[in-house]
């Protein structure tokens, strides 16, 4: 924003050299101020507004001339966490009201998942995957996408059957895959998909059930991020996200030996890439 111009003048800047009359420009500015929820802020200067309000004014200025395409280049990166979460919701609602095709560049995966209708994941200038947020997160097409969007525990494995993979001496059940038997692959699972079963092995348990030592717990508000060490997977620590309720219910604590389940439908295989 231009610091020496009022909010009204900032929004009107792109309209002043058009064929619109002064009354039409004033009406458009008033309409946009109402749209972004700042109807009484027109006479103020940018320095008198919060960072979040300034971003909304900048967006109003960008759409004042009625563009057919809008490019937002990391518009929320300079804001604090709470304002960022609030504004991404506001921008999405505003974009839907306007119906303007919008491309938003971001390095914030959570921002992309929450705001986008479709996501393009790029790596060194090349497109890795295009899809809905759900497709990109739940059905990543490459190891880069799987690792970049959200957290992943990664293992080196060998395909041992149509729905089987071997990691060291341990065989895991998984969904059917496209790889031939004996193929070396990278195996991944998301932390939130790992199920804690407790200190004792339940009488009824599914496939892919193992014991592991809980070596680290990090409290992240609504869940605990845990690091687990298992003899079944000597290569790497397993990262698991357990809900606060699950930790309380199962009395989970650091250094405990815990039984966990890796659901077969949550295990994904990709072309092997060295870490």
Regions found by a protein language model. Give the residues of each.
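ABC ATPase nucleotide-binding domains
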Residues: 1-144
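Structural motif
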Residues: 126, 163-164, 193, 266
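C-terminal boundary and immediately downstream tail of ABC-type ATPase nucleotide-binding domains
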Residues: 138-161, 188
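OB-fold (S1/OB) nucleic-acid-binding surfaces
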Residues: 167-170, 229-237
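Short aromatic-glycine-enriched beta-strand elements
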Residues: 222-227
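Short, structured beta-strand/loop micro-motifs enriched in basic residues and often containing a Trp
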Residues: 239-242
């Amino acid at each position: 924003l231009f610091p020496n111009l009022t909010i009204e003048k900032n929004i009107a800047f792109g309209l002043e050299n058009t064929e619109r009359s002064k009354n039409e420009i004033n009406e458009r500015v008033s309409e946009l101020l109402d749209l972004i929820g700042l109807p009484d802020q027109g006479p103020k200067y940018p320095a008198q507004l919060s960072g979040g309000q300034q971003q909304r004014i900048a967006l109003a200025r960008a759409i004042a001339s009625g563009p057919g395409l809008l490019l937002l280049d990391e518009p929320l990166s300079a804001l604090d966490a709470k304002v960022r979460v609030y504004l991404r919701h506001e921008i999405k609602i505003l974009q839907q009201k306007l119906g303007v095709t919008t491309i938003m560049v971001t390095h914030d995966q959570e921002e992309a998942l929450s705001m986008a209708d479709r996501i393009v994941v790029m790596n060194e200038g090349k497109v890795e995957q295009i899809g809905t947020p759900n497709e990109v997160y739940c059905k990543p097409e490459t190891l880069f996408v799987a690792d970049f969007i959200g957290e992943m525990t990664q293992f080196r494995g060998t395909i041992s059957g149509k729905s089987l993979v071997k990691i060291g001496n341990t065989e895991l059940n998984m969904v059917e895959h496209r790889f031939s038997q004996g193929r070396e692959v990278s195996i991944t699972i998301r932390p939130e998909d790992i199920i804690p079963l407790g200190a004792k092995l339940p009488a009824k348990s599914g496939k892919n059930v193992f014991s592991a030592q809980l070596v680290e717990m990090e409290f992240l508000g609504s869940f605990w991020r845990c690091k687990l060490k298992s003899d079944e997977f000597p290569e790497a620590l397993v990262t698991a996200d357990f809900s606060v309720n699950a930790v309380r219910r199962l009395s989970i604590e650091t250094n405990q030996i815990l039984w966990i389940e890796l659901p077969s439908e949550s295990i994904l295989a990709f072309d092997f890439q060295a870490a």
